[in-house]
Amino acid sequence: NLSVNLQDLESIGWLKLKEIPEGSLYTTFDIVENPKNLQLVEMDMFSRFSAMEGDVDLAMSFFSNTSQEKYNFNLLKLFDENIAYPQVVAVREEDKDAQWVKDFMDAFTSQEQVDRINEKNTPTLSWKILFEVKEDSASLEKSEEKSRKADPNKTTIKLGVTPSFEYYIDYIPEMMGEWGYTVEVVSLDSPVAANTALAEGSIDVNYFQHLPYLLAFNESNGTRLHPCEPYIMSSMDCIASKKYKTLEEVPDGASIAVADDASNLSINLEDLQSIGWLKLKE
């Protein structure tokens, strides 16, 4: 996530990053220019928006309507799909071919799910991408939906989400319930807790992370969590503030909360460079 934040900052020209090998992640050591003298404060994703109450001037994190309503911030910048990574549903490797996983993904990418989300979400590029993914997928026929039966080997599914992602899955229990499943939503307080719970088996599936974060977690922890396809681009990084309403108002020396993990920090740095606020090493 730290890498994500750095790429975000590069994309708006607030930083310049050095060039690194493809597939590598940016760190703060890769900054070569910091023309706005930004003070980067590394925080977990659940602390960044709340920190704007006093500790920091700006925050970078995933944008959602629920977060904006909860923290009442100004949206200064929403980064486009060239920076964002695909969000993934994750299961344990041994479950990836199970019928219940296929059923879950059909529900998650169904037209009904997309329509429910778009009814209550301000239209953004992120949900247009989700809609396009579904347009290119094989839609569920109504007759198939009604006749579908739950996987006899597993009818109760524990779905783990972090707080900011509960918004995106509230229709799934209803839809899968029509097929004979019981979906229990388990709220977990951090990304690490959500992946640890999945690896240990206290939940069956989770949704909250992008692909680089999942791969980095597997590598660091020796876990075998599997990203299910299709990948869904359901959230975009943003720069938010309670003090300022536009990027132009942000003074030199401002403090900005960025990700405290490598994958998202790298993107944050690149985004800051894209808006001219940093320059990263080659």
Segments from the language model and where they lie:
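Extracellular/periplasmic juxtamembrane helices and adjacent flexible linkers that interface
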Residues: 105-153
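Short helix-initiation/N-cap motifs at beta->coil->alpha
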Residues: 23-50, 185-196, 282
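A bilobed periplasmic-binding-protein/Venus flytrap-type ligand-binding module shared by bacterial periplasmic
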Residues: 84-103, 235-248
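A conserved helix-loop-strand patch within extracytoplasmic ligand-binding domains
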Residues: 1-16, 111-114, 228-281
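Beta->alpha turn/N-cap motifs
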Residues: 44-45, 54-66, 164, 189-191, ...
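Short, polar/charged alpha-helical segment
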Residues: 162-187, 192-193
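Immediate post-signal peptide segment of exported/extracytoplasmic ligand-binding proteins
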Residues: 135-158, 176-177, 246-254
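Ligand-binding "clamshell"
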Residues: 53-55, 67-79, 216-228, 243-244
